[in-house]
Amino acid sequence: MALPEHLQRHLEAGRALTAAGGYRGRFAPSPTGLLHLGNLQTALLSWLAARQAGGAWLLRIDDLDTPRNRAGAIEAIQSDLRWLGLKWDGPVLLQSERRGIYHSWLSWLRRSGRLFACRCSRRELADQPIYSGFCRQAVHNWGWQRQRLPSWRLRVADDDPHGSGDVVLRRADGFIAYQLATVIDELSFGINDVVRGADLREALPAQRSLFAALGEAPPRFRHGPLLCDASGQKLSKREACAGLKPLRDAGLDAAAVIGRLASGLQLVAPEARISATELLEHLTQQAINAVIS
């Protein structure tokens, strides 16, 4: 089935941005709470990679999962980045303002016969690292389970080299899935290099499968180290991390915080005080790339 004209225009706009040359990166936090130091460390690394390459760095807010969003978080994210000197290019991109385009892609994929309804419960899926394809394989007599709203999955060949299994594009609660929104946004805005936290490495197979299904080349995905708490657990916004406030209340300025973040990445000596701009001038592309895998 041919791609509708308005979706083709979106793809062509993204291709034009990529074809123009140059690095195009982004930072894409979700507004489920304040940015903790781990988020800010990733933001710094992403910003450094883009600026060292002389490229663009966009700020996208992944706010589709509205029940989890926290009031005031979008404004706080922007305020913290500005305070640290991590300036982005262009307007802030809100995924919540792009629901129409995501649903258009979902509708086209569904009409093309590339999606199927999945009524497996979370409990049934819990022991499947890769989806078994149960709902794809046959028509089942669901009985009362037919009343359960389905998720919609992309059919992925069993021999797909990315090993993702069938990818959820719309969740059973009706929300557009992270994978679909992310892939469409990378294409729409011509993103060609993504630096993000290592916890998102597990999203790579699904995203690469979706790029392949759309016939589009993925960006280069790279991952920076995670910042963990004293128990070795990844910091989480949902666990009421206080973000920058305790540091600012203790009298630390932006240079001290940038120094702490850069020291955690082994880019500067411990206790260094350095602004984001000074750090950028201090580092080579090789030094930044050495931290990213």
Swiss-Prot record:
PROSITE patterns: AA_TRNA_LIGASE_I (PS00178). The keyword Hydrolase does not apply. L-glutamate binds at R26, F27, A28, P29, S30, D62, Y178, R196. Keywords: Aminoacyl-tRNA synthetase, ATP-binding, Ligase, Metal-binding, Nucleotide-binding, Zinc. The keyword Nucleotide-binding applies. Binds 1 zinc ion per subunit. GO terms for biological process: glutamyl-tRNA aminoacylation; tRNA modification. Its cofactor is Zn(2+). A motif ('HIGH' region) lies at residues 29-39. GO terms for molecular function: ATP binding; glutamate-tRNA ligase activity; zinc ion binding. It is an enzyme of class 6 (ligase). Zn(2+) binds at C118, C120, Y131, C135. Its EC number is 6.1.1.-. It holds the Pfam family tRNA-synt_1c. It comes from the Bacteria. A motif ('KMSKS' region) lies at residues 234-238. GO terms for cellular component: cytosol. ATP binds at K237. Catalyzes the tRNA-independent activation of glutamate in presence of ATP and the subsequent transfer of glutamate onto a tRNA(Asp). Glutamate is transferred on the 2-amino-5-(4,5-dihydroxy-2-cyclopenten-1-yl) moiety of the queuosine in the wobble position of the QUC anticodon. Belongs to the class-I aminoacyl-tRNA synthetase family. GluQ subfamily. This is Glutamyl-Q tRNA(Asp) synthetase. It comes from Synechococcus sp. (strain CC9605). The gene is gluQ.
